[in-house]
Amino acid sequence: MFIDSVKITLASGDGGKGAVSFRREKHVPLGGPDGGDGGNGGDIIFVCDNNTHTLVNFKGKRELRAQNGAGGMGRNKNGKKGENLELIVPEGTQVIDAQTNEILLDLTKEGQRELFLKGGKGGLGNTHFKHATNQRPDYAQPGIKGESRLVRLELKLIADVGLVGFPNVGKSTLISVVSNAKPEIANYEFTTLTPKLGLVDVNEYNSFVMADIPGIIEGASGGKGLGLAFLKHIERTSFLLFVLDPMRQMPLKEQFIVLRKELEKFSNELFGRKFGIMISKSDSVRLGEEFAEQIALNINELDNYLKEINNPQSFLIKVSSLEKTGLKELKFMLLEEIKTLRNNKKNLTI
């Protein structure tokens, strides 16, 4: 089950209370204080793990709490620290304050560890309160309460290439033939109900991650169809590949315009992101000469439109996933784009 959003209360452990204790030894009827300190409460720690792909482990849980620190004991024995609670989450998980929507943590790298809530400090035992005017203090500190916070965990998939298109245009078929992903494929809309990641091996030394995002429909940015629930996953993709279907009644140019408008409404940054265009189901041109001519006119109209607008488009290619034509060229084109983006990012961090 793919779960990409959960609301949960997280709480670090309370500090253990300090002990009130006195030495009890033979021949020492009024021994001094020997109460140990309470242990600190356990911390809440987030750990990013790329072997985890969903937030399903948090589903149905209202609260997760780290262990409380143990109380202090006599003979100056300190209480044990409460065990930390480590929360394993996928790459791309954001921890958001459920009330203010402030992003508190952004976990994007394998092995990333972030202390989120510190456990409460253990109370001091009565040993600390002995002084000249009070040799037998009968007071010890209570432990300090741990922290608590209501948060929303949001998963935004991280991929090099995000597939953008209407439902049933061939995105799932494409990712199934170029990568190790095995999405459900059927001839009806919204076959893909959850995002899928696939590793695309271009050659022995180069690969990239592709994300199959559930189909977008007009009005998706306002919540129609699968709407906002999955548009957010496109935010973490470096490069967009628009998949356009020549078999749809809507012309290719109109498909592209509608898809781009939905991205623009959702995020201005997405609208300006670099992209390529793939015309899917190119084998369909075999259905007749007249249909082939119509598709050619469609593609020409789209090409002219792209030249008219100021856009970051890098290529336009025809592909048949069924006949496996154009796939090799597509993979190399995408790899070159990803390499360029990676190098640019690397230069920015130097």
UniProtKB/Swiss-Prot annotation:
PROSITE patterns: G_OBG, GTP1_OBG, OBG
E.C. designation(s): 3.6.5.-
Pfam families in the record: GTP1_OBG, MMR_HSR1
GO terms, biological process: ribosome biogenesis
Gene Ontology, cellular component aspect: cytoplasm
Keyword Cytoplasm included in the entry's annotation: yes
Keyword terms of this UniProt record: Cytoplasm, GTP-binding, Hydrolase, Magnesium, Metal-binding, Nucleotide-binding
Enzyme class: hydrolase
Database matches in Gene3D superfamilies: GTP1/OBG domain, P-loop containing nucleotide triphosphate hydrolases
GO MF annotation: an example: magnesium ion binding
Required co-factors: Mg(2+)
Subcellular location: Cytoplasm
Residue ranges occupied by any OBG-type G domain in the UniProt entry: 159-339
Sequence positions that bind GTP: 165-172, 190-194, 212-215, 280-283, 320-322
Binding-site residues for Mg(2+), renumbered to this chain: S172, T192
Obg domain location: 1-158
Disulfide bonds: none
Subunit structure: Monomer.
Protein's job: An essential GTPase which binds GTP, GDP and possibly (p)ppGpp with moderate affinity, with high nucleotide exchange rates and a fairly low GTP hydrolysis rate. Plays a role in control of the cell cycle, stress response, ribosome biogenesis and in those bacteria that undergo differentiation, in morphogenesis control.
Family statement: Belongs to the TRAFAC class OBG-HflX-like GTPase superfamily. OBG GTPase family.
Protein name listed in UniProt: GTPase Obg
Species per Swiss-Prot/TrEMBL record: Campylobacter jejuni subsp. jejuni serotype O:2 (strain ATCC 700819 / NCTC 11168)
Gene assigned in the entry: obg
